[in-house]
Regions:
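Charged, amphipathic alpha-helical linker segments immediately N-terminal to NTP-binding catalytic cores
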Residues: 3-57
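Conserved ASCE/P-loop NTPase catalytic core
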Residues: 36-171
């Protein structure tokens, strides 16, 4: 994949201020628990996946986790990682797929088709045009959700690439 333009969620200005004000008014006297239940109830209606609120909540917490946090005067990494474990056909992939679609931020890939180069990127040479960087999914999903379905099938090299990128914040 070659990205010519990347739009980050915080730079998008597609919010309707009137709708935000309506939500603010609606939530004014609600507790955090009531607000969260309203969000999860509406996600169940949107996704048509019932009984997987725990997965939706984990995905939302991961997406809205701050990228960096100032702690004791130092900037610390703050991005979140979530793993969904469970039996097959229990709604894990479909829940995150619907969440990614709703937030319009991220992608779901399968471990069978993932490679270290596909996750991080590679330098590619094109004859007579020089070199360019072919960015992988980790870079393309910066500040978005990247879900790897069947992550237990990733090779050790892929896990190493993911672990190093997660540890350092650099691909």
């Amino acid at each position: 994949l070659l990205a010519y333009e990347i739009e980050f969620p915080e730079e998008a200005h597609a919010f309707d201020p009137e709708k935000i004000l309506k939500l603010k008014t609606k939530f004014k006297d609600w507790s955090i628990k009531e607000r969260l239940n309203w969000i999860l109830d509406n996600f169940e209606k949107y996704s048509q996946i019932v009984g997987r609120r725990n997965l939706a909540l984990a995905g939302l917490l991961c997406f809205f986790t701050p990228t960096w946090v100032k702690f004791n005067g130092e900037m610390q990494r703050g991005w979140g990682n979530v793993i969904f474990c469970g039996d097959t056909t229990t709604g894990k992939s479909e829940t995150i797929r619907k969440l990614i679609r709703l937030l319009n931020a991220g992608m779901l890939i399968t471990a069978e088709t993932a490679s270290a180069v596909g996750l991080t990127g590679a330098a590619t040479q094109v004859s007579k045009e020089g070199w360019f960087v072919d960015w992988g999914f980790l870079v393309l999903c910066d500040r978005k959700l990247l879900a790897v379905d069947g992550a237990h099938k990733l090779s050790l090299a892929n896990w190493a690439a993911l672990a190093e990128a997660e540890r350092s914040g650099v691909v």
